[in-house]
């Protein structure tokens, strides 16, 4: 037999195994016969792959299912507790880390808030969170299978953080540092791309194929899912729409541009606008998204107007995106999603100003995952990297 034939047979076998596992994961519990029907594989192939997956502790046998005639079939379950992933969202002033099982269920989480930290200081906080999550991890056949990290900046295809202006990071190889310390695969992803994937897999975007995810925190990032797939652009740098110009003669942004969208429609812009309007919390606490939300909830009309102003600017940028991509769904996530009550009306007003042809079958929704979309997205990347058969490595 030629080597190429052997290689191709090996690739097919690995592909079949991955297909069987994915089918069990999606339709659990499921019988061997139903796997064959779902995948089109013959029963012998299914039986062989199921045996391997059972030996590897990635699936389990449960009690018999309902019979359609003859013996009741043995049902198969995806073993979501075979291992665990860690997903981390590094923001400008916080780190959120979550521990998930292989199905994406959150088993533990840790949050650290900070202000104006250096890279080295943030790295130490990151180690603290990851160490704590690992310590809390239950015993399992595979233990920690991977770590995913979302960052607010451009990330190269090999995981180097090229530029994160709001963190003052440039050319940071965090992936190499993390893999050396924890000895597991580490994936670094733009936080908005990860958030878009998290919403598509677990949240408001489950039923949509063309999604614009707008991550609104200290800055603004955008993740694009087009025809069901995450779009990253030629070099992986798509989605930096927080830096599109909406005011030609506007103030200078950290990125070097003028009049960037995030200078007018982000959490930072909200707090800055409230400060300029002389708004002060009654308790004497510092101005923040939380304190402004509380004032708005208590009926402060001045604060509500500031929210509505930010919502209007948010709508301007979203309209530009709608006109370019014609999506079926726009999801607004990250920290400003908690202010939907004050942002929704001005957003709808701006939406009415976009091309009427683009408004048909379009929905604008707020995140169902709130601040967890990015962490869930990168944790899912880590789990799927472990579970997927990569033919490049065969």
Regions inferred by a protein language model and the residue ranges of each:
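Short, acidic, Ser/Thr-enriched surface-loop or helix-capping motifs
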Residues: 101, 156, 225
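Active-site/binding-pocket entry motifs
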Residues: 96, 153-155, 194, 202, ...
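ATP-binding/phosphotransfer module of carbohydrate and carboxylate kinases, centering on a glycine-rich
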Residues: 1-64, 68-143, 257, 261-394
């Amino acid at each position: 037999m030629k080597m190429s034939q052997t290689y191709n047979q090996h690739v097919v076998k690995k592909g079949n195994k991955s297909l069987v596992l994915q089918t069990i994961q999606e339709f659990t519990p499921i019988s061997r016969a139903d796997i064959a029907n779902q995948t089109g594989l013959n029963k012998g192939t299914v039986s062989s792959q199921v045996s391997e997956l059972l030996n590897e502790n990635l699936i389990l046998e449960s009690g018999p299912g309902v019979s359609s005639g003859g013996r009741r079939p043995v049902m198969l379950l995806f073993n979501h507790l075979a291992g665990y992933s860690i997903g981390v969202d590094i923001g400008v002033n916080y780190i959120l880390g979550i521990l998930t099982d292989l199905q994406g269920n959150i088993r533990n989480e840790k949050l650290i808030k900070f202000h104006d930290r250096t890279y080295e200081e943030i790295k130490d906080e990151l180690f603290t969170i990851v160490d704590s999550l690992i310590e809390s991890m239950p015993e399992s056949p595979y233990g920690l299978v991977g770590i995913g990290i979302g960052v607010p900046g451009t990330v190269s295809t090999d995981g180097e953080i090229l530029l994160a202006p709001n963190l003052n990071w440039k050319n940071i190889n965090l992936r190499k540092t993390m893999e050396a310390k924890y000895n597991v695969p580490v994936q670094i992803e733009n936080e908005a791309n990860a958030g878009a994937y998290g919403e598509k897999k677990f949240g408001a975007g489950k039923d949509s194929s063309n999604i614009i995810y707008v991550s609104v925190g200290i800055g603004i990032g955008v993740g694009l899912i087009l025809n069901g797939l995450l779009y990253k652009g030629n070099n992986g740098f798509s989605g930096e729409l927080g830096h599109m110009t909406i005011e030609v003669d506007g103030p200078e942004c950290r990125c070097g541009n003028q009049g960037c969208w995030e200078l007018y429609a982000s959490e930072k812009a909200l707090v800055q606008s409230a400060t300029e309007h002389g708004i002060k919390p009654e308790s004497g606490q510092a101005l923040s998204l939380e304190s402004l939300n509380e004032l708005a909830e208590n009926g402060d009309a001045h604060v509500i107007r500031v929210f509505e102003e930010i919502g209007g600017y948010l709508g301007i940028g979203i309209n530009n995106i709608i006109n370019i991509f014609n999506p079926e769904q726009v999801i607004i996530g990250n920290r400003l999603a908690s202010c939907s009550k004050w942002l929704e009306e001005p957003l709808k007003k701006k939406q009415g100003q976009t091309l009427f042809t683009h408004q048909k079958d379009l929905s604008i929704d707020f995140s169902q995952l709130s601040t967890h979309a990015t962490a869930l997205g990168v944790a899912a990347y880590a789990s799927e990297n472990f579970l997927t058969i990569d033919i490049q490595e065969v």
